[in-house]
UniProtKB/Swiss-Prot annotation:
Job of this protein: Catalyzes the attachment of L-aspartate to tRNA(Asp) in a two-step reaction: L-aspartate is first activated by ATP to form Asp-AMP and then transferred to the acceptor end of tRNA(Asp).
Similarity-based family: Belongs to the class-II aminoacyl-tRNA synthetase family. Type 1 subfamily.
Protein name: Aspartate--tRNA ligase
Keyword Transcription: no
Subcellular location: Cytoplasm
Stretches the record annotates as Aspartate: 198-201
One cellular-component annotation, GO: cytoplasm
Organism of origin: Streptococcus pneumoniae (strain P1031)
Catalytic activity: tRNA(Asp) + L-aspartate + ATP = L-aspartyl-tRNA(Asp) + AMP + diphosphate
UniProt EC number: 6.1.1.12
Amino acid sequence: MKRSMYAGRVREEHIGQEITLKGWVGRRRNLGGLIFIDLRDREGIMQLVINPEKVSAEVMATAESLRSEFVIEVTGQVAAREQANDKLPTGAVELNVTALIVLNTAKTTPFEIKDGIEANDDTRLRYRYLDLRRPEMLENLKLRAKVTHSIRNYLDELEFIDVETPFLSKSTPEGARDYLVPSRVNKGHFYALPQSPQITKQLLMNAGFDRYYQIVKCFRDEDLRGDRQPEFTQVDLETSFLTEKEIQDITEGLIARVMKETKGIEVTLPFPRMKYDDAMALYGSDKPDTRFDMLLQDLTEVVKGVDFKVFSEAPAVKAIVVKGAADNYSRKDIDKMTEVAKQYGAKGLAWVKVVDGELNGPVAKFLTGIQEELTTALALEDKDLVLFVADTLEVVNATLGALRGRIAKELGLIDNDKFNFLWVVDWPMFEWSEEEGRYMSAHHPFTLPQEGTAHELEGDLAKVRAIAYDIVLNGYELGGGSLRINQKDLQERMFKALGFSTEEANDQFGFLLEAMDYGFPPHGGLAIGLDRFVMLLAGEENIREVIAFPKNNKATDPMTQAPSTVALKQLEELSLQVEEDETNKTN
């Protein structure tokens, strides 16, 4: 029979109606001769009642054979429950079953289909189709669908054009490693899966599209963590003839629309703006979490005269004050934080506690001469814990920024109901890479430099600033954008500053440089990480929880066993040969 409605949508208004439902058996209970079944579908749970006095012996026998995750079809009359269940939207009603059909049976599942399970991540991914039956996973993906629907409606209203760009593209050097796809037809040549549609969307501006968007899959072969995946989705925008502020206004409107339609939250516009240098100085991060205080305090000049060379001779000394937390952290706890500090390049972590108005701790004796000045500078009070790092400015900021976030989580200082958006602006154009031994693009090599600093492309690259902007939410980079270079000579200077020879630039980006000979308009845009945005809206800590079929931290899929070896014939067709070892053999 045709399904009347979803089980999770049956309400008191349906009492007395005969309906047909289809779904999965969640739980089965025998009470006083009656059989109670929780029927589950994507919209929720409905209680079924099977009374031996009101059904045939065949229906009763079928009901007694049911096990968890059997797929069934039931017909019956909606009735009011004697005792309502306030925890369920359907809790005021139940279905008195008159007909029951088993559509499919099921083996015992490797974990219960319910929220709050304790199965490990790889087991959940191995049986992802079962994991996705759980209500919280269904809700996460329904939220994701609502977010994308809201985004599309908003951008369509603003006359953005949805354009698909190629997945098989050209490998270019800047950024993370590419996923390469060998060409069978052009032997020895490779496509790259795009890390973003950056260049193609810029070319669409040259083609006169004016406003482009795409909700697009992107690929990066990089080390994974909780908010990264080898394939991810971004909301990609590009516009012509707009200023930085106009692009930001459009983005703020988009986020405000999504927040209102999916969370019922009215966000305050415009979002705050913070310069990159201020974010690093005060929060130790280019993606500051502004939901709590505990700002970094610069003490470099204050400690210059102390008889402690670690402080007095350090390029930079900063501290964070953990208010009233002296008793929360033992020496052993602080030793653990010291190990965290070392992960960020710090040689150690100095600390003092304020006890009865005095400084106590390993370095307190070196600070007696400046205790009053230090107390004033840090606004110290009894029971405060002070953590110091002395090193290069980069190490100091990174270390204290990481400790700041860790401590806030441990002490419950973060209001998880807050959504604090802000723009980080006035970025450096380049950042120094110790690994590469050269300057790299902080964003990408197509970013427009600020006019007053562009002359440093042939001078001190550290002084070049970009017309770039990142949007940050609760300590996560939600997205980033910039105005782009549209003048050929400036783009060539940018490539040269990054170490490209003329030949290399033409080989890698010649098509873009050629396009700049044909009236390339001023343009700029932005991309928002959809997975990360939905993760934060859903209150999750890992983007796997909002992606239907993600990879694990080894970039593998435990369900399909991808990536896998392939037949030797396939490799021969591609003119490829794999060096074999015990862990990597072709079939």
